Amino acid sequence: MEWLLGKKEIKKVALVSYFYETNQTKMLIPDLERHFNWSTYMIKSLINELLHDQKRFGVPEQGQLRLSPSEREVELIPGNRAYLLSLTASYIKESYLFRTLITGMNNTPTALSVLAEHLDVPKLHLKNDIRQFNDRARPANIEINTYNRLQGDEWAIRFMLVSIFKNVIHDETELTDFFEADIIQQANQVARFYQMSNVEAAQLTQHQHLSLMIELAVWLVRLNARCPVSNSTQPHVLLADDQLDEAYKSLLILNESVIRRFVRLPPHELSLESRYGVLMLVRVGLSAGHLSGNANKEVGKVHAMLSNIAQTVYREFFGQDMPQDLTTQLANELEQPAMMLLFLTHINYQGNDDYTISHSLFPEYTLFTDRFLTRVNEYLGIKTLNIKNRLFKVFYNLFIGLLDRTVMIPQLHISLRINDAFMHKEVATMLERQAELRIDVSDDMKQCDMIISDTLLPRAQAAQVIVWTTLPTFAEFDSFLHTAVNLTMNKFTESIYGRQK
């Protein structure tokens, strides 16, 4: 979402993000200067503004940026993304372009001079921001026209608005900052209607309910603004109405009831809006498991392509076919990602999403996901990394949930040479419950990858020795985890590349 920010805000977010990317807690200002190629004055100015902004925005204290008394060192504990997310969301809310989009989504014509005065920004500045947005969004067939209204591919417009709002709204009370009271009231009425009429809707989590409210608010705003989805050139994802299963037919009927309550549309537009509503509910998590049986051939081809590539990468990594039960489970879980990929390729997605694969607790899954998405890009002939970056988190989480850790994570053999019986037992328990590792604890020093001892072992060879005289501190255990994960990853890559030679 950095394209919504001003130039200085982009630099501030980049500065904070660098701590997360490098997993560093402290950095010298000269090191930051060399990395970003910025002057000392600019670095210190940005840091002072960040210190002011985090107070102004009420950013959570945990993990806040700090400047040393000597003003030569910056400290940030990157273990909690609340700071980065809160800071970015606050900058987006204040950006002129974001506020222009909120005005434009209502489809009310507004003169540039009036809008600039309302936003308290120079007219030329706002004009340049809109021009840059149009240059960026034009490949997706979206633009802000001369009357400062959003026009173009309606499905892409709604997708963009929902994505933006989900980045800045983290509680339902914040909806009032961006939507009129009557829209929120209507969205609440529709949500309750779905919950009373659909068993799955009644079981939505709090997060899913917030997602549903954002989707509904955007949908209702665009419906009331007479911006029909018939203006979209998106592929028809679903089968014809009479070919849908009973679950989706019932959702179509529910959606038609909702639409008729607020606007009057001709039958063709009513059908398209109702079908859009079904996909909206699928994105929230309703009836997602039915998608493959109701999607058209184009989605089926994308789905089959993703499944085949995942099985191919699995075969390359482990020298065996993916088990049949896992193949079946994978096919079910790929339904929503297939629809996302189809949509992103159709609009030629050009967003620059956060994509950091360093310092993962599960580097094996990171490598698998990276290889998988690289193959997807190659198959589709995509030269850029934008779509890969956008979908990385989706597939990374999917593979962590699906692929057996006994297959993905090599076993690490650790010898414990600890004399104290209680400490020996407690350390063994600590090691064996680490989800990111598969540790075999023994007393054998000959066939081991690491040794943990409570004394020095001068004669120990061919293994890394870690000495803990007491139960480890946070820092000691964190250092051990880094070492153990790296050793495991080395074994993983050696087995893969050794097999492929």
Descriptions of predicted regions:
Residues 1-501:
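A cross-family "folded-core" feature that marks the main globular domain of proteins
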